[in-house]
């Protein structure tokens, strides 16, 4: 489905509007009015560009300032740094070995049963936590 308009003028008429005998020239004023939106859009783009450049420069300066090493006096003055020292790798616990250890306790009946570590979740609970996003959320309300 196509639609087209075809305008033809008779030979004795002109394309300028009839003004009742007065001739007015709207050429320059119309051209200026048509150019205002593009000038405003250009000004807004330039302002946005300058804003982005300024933000990027300020964030780069902030990163460079935070990357510089601390002076000893700054460490003493800052409670955040002095109270939270980095832990050395020797103090970290190896959690892989804890899964392999098995502790058995003799019950009163004489049978041996594995002891449940109440500070460590069971393997089934860890599996459930790892797959929480598969379970749909159902409400009973």
Swiss-Prot record:
InterPro entries: Opalin
Basic and acidic residues: compositionally biased ranges: 65-94
Record keyword Membrane present: yes
List of glycosylated residues: 6, 12, 14
Gene Ontology process terms (BP): regulation of oligodendrocyte differentiation
Membrane topology classification: Single-pass type I membrane protein
Region Disordered, annotated ranges: 61-98
Region (Required for plasma membrane localization): 77-93
TM annotation in the entry: 30-50
Coiled-coil residue windows: none
Membrane topology (Extracellular): 1-29
A single Gene Ontology CC term: Golgi apparatus
Keyword line: Cell membrane, Glycoprotein, Membrane, Transmembrane, Transmembrane helix
Cytoplasmic face residues: 51-141
Source domain of life: Eukaryota
Subcellular location: Cell membrane
Transferase keyword on record: no
UniProt function note: Central nervous system-specific myelin protein that increase myelin genes expression during oligodendrocyte differentiation. Promotes oligodendrocyte terminal differentiation.
Name used for this protein in its record: Opalin
């Amino acid at each position: 489905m196509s639609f087209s308009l075809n305008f033809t003028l008779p030979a004795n008429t002109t394309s300028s509007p009839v003004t009742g005998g007065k001739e007015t020239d709207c050429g320059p004023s119309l051209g200026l009015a048509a150019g205002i939106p593009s000038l405003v859009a250009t000004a807004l783009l330039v302002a946005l560009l300058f804003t982005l450049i300024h933000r990027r420069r300020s964030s780069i300066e902030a990163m460079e300032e935070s990357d510089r090493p601390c002076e000893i006096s700054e460490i003493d003055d800052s409670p955040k740094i002095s109270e939270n020292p980095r832990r050395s790798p020797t103090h970290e616990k190896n959690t892989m070995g804890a899964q392999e250890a098995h502790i058995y306790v003799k019950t009163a009946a004489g049978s041996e049963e594995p002891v449940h570590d109440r500070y460590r979740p069971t393997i089934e609970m860890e599996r459930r936590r790892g797959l929480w996003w598969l379970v749909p959320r159902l409400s009973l309300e």
